[in-house]
Amino acid sequence: MKPVIKNIDSFSNPILGTKDGVPTVVSLYHDHAPGESSKHHSHPWEHQVYITSGSGIVWVDGEEFSIKQGDFILVPPNSTHHFKNTGDGMLSRITFNPKESEEYL
């Protein structure tokens, strides 16, 4: 396997995945404008989320957690969850999923 380098300003989701030769992890990038939320959903895999900028709230199985730039979040498998930007600037995050998630994208 060879290294793959992509710039955040010129990519499409997934950032990195099996099409790039990555065998186990799919990386996705999401931006949320102030007041915007992601879709409330669940899936059978856990995933990790890194907040690259902004602040907001993540709901996981009905429980609310404040999030901000620099936070790393583990969302358990089969949990219902969504993110909401409660700040004044953009809420940006990178999500790391197992490769099985790619078929749902």
Q: What is each stretch, according to the model?
A:
Residues 1-25:
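A short, N-terminal "cap"/entry segment at the start of jelly-roll beta-barrel domains
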Residues 16-19, 37-43, 84-86, 105:
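Short histidine-centered beta-strand/loop micro-motifs
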Residues 27-43, 77:
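Conserved short histidine dyad/triad with adjacent acidic residue
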Residues 31-32, 43-58:
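Short, conserved beta-strand element in jelly-roll/cupin
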Residues 48, 55-57, 64, 80, ...:
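Structural motif
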Residues 62-77:
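Short acidic-glycine-tyrosine-enriched beta hairpin
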Residues 77-103:
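Ligand-binding loop in jelly-roll beta-barrel domains
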